[in-house]
Structure formats: C-alpha cells, structure tokens
A protein has these predicted regions:
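Long, basic/Gly/Ser/Thr-rich N-terminal segments
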Residues: 1-97
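Short acidic, glycine/serine/threonine-rich loops at helix termini
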Residues: 23-30, 106, 141, 153-154, ...
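Single conserved hydrophobic/aromatic residue that forms the stacking wall/gate
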Residues: 243, 247-254
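Long hydrophobic segments that form regular secondary structure
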Residues: 224-244
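Generic, well-ordered alpha-helical scaffold segments in large soluble proteins
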Residues: 3, 109-114, 131, 154-158
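Glycine-rich phosphate-binding P-loop
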Residues: 130-162
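Conserved nucleotide-sensing/catalytic segment adjacent to the nucleotide-binding pocket
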Residues: 160-225
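N-terminal pre-Walker A segment at the start of P-loop NTPase domains
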Residues: 101-127
Length: 254
C-alpha cells in the first residue's frame, strides 16, 4: 500500500463481473499503469457514471505491476513476482508482473469460490447463441489457448462471451464485458471477427509492433507465444450487449 501511495498517478476502475444482476460482483481495480486500467475497463462490465459517486465494491484489486520485492521471504512468498488473494478480505494483490491477464483471472477465481454456494456453475468456456432462438445456447470448454474464442466467433450466431460464464436455473450469463483473445498467427482470413475487433480502444499485449510503421506482427513469437488482444463486446457485430441483463434460457449444447 505504501508503494502505491507514493505513486504520482494511480488509475482506478470501478465496474462489475457478471451480467446477471442477481449474481454479479462489484469490483474496484487500482493500477500503476494506465493500460492495465484500460484492460479492466475493456474486460469487465462498466459501472454507469451515476453509480460512481456512492460506489461500494465487493472486491478490490491492487495491481503493483512494477514492484519487485527485495526480500520475498519477509512477506511469506518465494519470489519477487506473486499474486496474493484473500477470500476472507476480498482483496487481490498483484506484484511484479505486467501480465494483465492476472487481473481478470483473480476475479474468475473469486466467482468460482462464491457462486456454487448460490446455485451457479462457474465455467471456463466461451458461449454463443442462435440469432433466431435465445434458447439455443452453445458452450465450448477448454483451457487457455485451446480455441474457445475462435470456436465461439461464429458469424451465424451471436457471441455471449469468450472465456468465463455462469450457468444457473435462470440461464447462461457472461462474467465479463469483453474478450481476451490469443493473436499469435492471427489473420483476417482465418479469424475475421477477432481481426476486425482490433482497433482504437482495444489493447494488444506481448505483440511485436514495428517501431516505424506501428503495424503489429502477429506472426512473431519473439517475446512469447502468449500474445493477446483485449476488446469490448461492443466491437463484435451482433454480440449480446455486455451491459444487458437479458439472460438466455437453459437449453445448452456442449
């Protein structure tokens, strides 16, 4: 906390995880890097401006991405990089990593812990729905990087979300308000929905960018194969509105 207080600028995001108002969590994210705050704004569901003056959150994330612990053992951890999460205090501390994915995964962990107690099955999956039948929902399970985003990006169906969902007796609902897609070897021909979503307002991560032309090189794995892009559902044509509380009925094809 002292480290963050000493910063000239700290960026704050307030919003929700969970499109279903019955089960959503109110989240506040404090970051030292502006692009991490933009990441949170893109991935979570934004609070309305009139909600912010009296905002009271369920979970707090403190993202000290540039902090390196000089003596990790002093704090009960093994290395300078750590993600510490307290389910009792509803607090997440991210230290020493600039990988923005830790922000979203920490809240997914929280929802995995809390929601089964209230009858919701948390799922690491993508999901879409038929354009003419809201009861025809498909979910695609898989670990990170196995193609969930690609499979759900079907132009003949409406995207619900690409990574984290809940399944209750009220239907399937998205935990998030955006997508977090891998973009190694991305092409317009192969994955047009993802390609077209990369524009002003999206965030590319770990992608090599030409220093002169500023054109991303999606074929390069010079830094890592885990190259990513984050974009709001608003950037996907005919996607289910990320602020919508309308649910899809429980008729799922897996």
């Amino acid at each position: 906390m002292e480290y963050m207080r000493a910063k000239k600028d700290v960026f704050r995001f307030d919003g929700y995880a969970g499109a279903d108002t019955k089960y959503r969590l109110k989240v506040s994210v404090f970051t030292e890097e502006a692009w991490h705050s933009l990441f949170a704004k893109t991935l979570f569901i934004n609070a309305e401006p009139n909600e912010l003056p009296n905002w009271s959150n369920d979970w707090t994330i403190i993202d000290a991405s540039r902090l390196e612990l000089e003596d990790p053992a002093k704090y009960g951890v093994r290395q300078k990089l750590c993600i510490v999460q307290s389910l009792e205090r509803k607090l997440v501390l991210i230290v020493g990593t600039r990988y923005a994915g830790e922000i979203k995964k920490s809240i997914f962990y929280a929802m995995n812990y809390d929601l089964p107690e209230v009858g919701v099955f948390p799922m690491h999956c993508s999901a879409n729905v038929a354009k003419d039948d809201p009861s025809n929902v498909a979910v695609f399970f898989g670990l990170s990087g196995t193609g969930k985003t690609t499979l759900s990006a079907d132009p003949k169906r409406r995207l619900i979300g690409d990574d984290e969902h809940g399944w209750s007796d009220r239907g399937v609902f998205n935990f998030e308000g955006g997508c977090y897609a891998k973009c190694i070897n991305l092409s317009q021909e192969g994955e047009p929905q993802i390609w077209n979503a990369i524009r002003f307002g999206s965030v590319i991560e770990n992608v090599v960018v030409d220093p002169v032309t500023r054109v991303p090189n999606y074929d390069s794995a010079a830094r890592t194969e885990n190259t990513r892009v984050t974009y709001p559902l608003d950037f996907v044509p005919d996607a289910v509105d990320r602020k919508s509380t309308r649910l899809n009925s429980s008729h799922e094809w897996i």
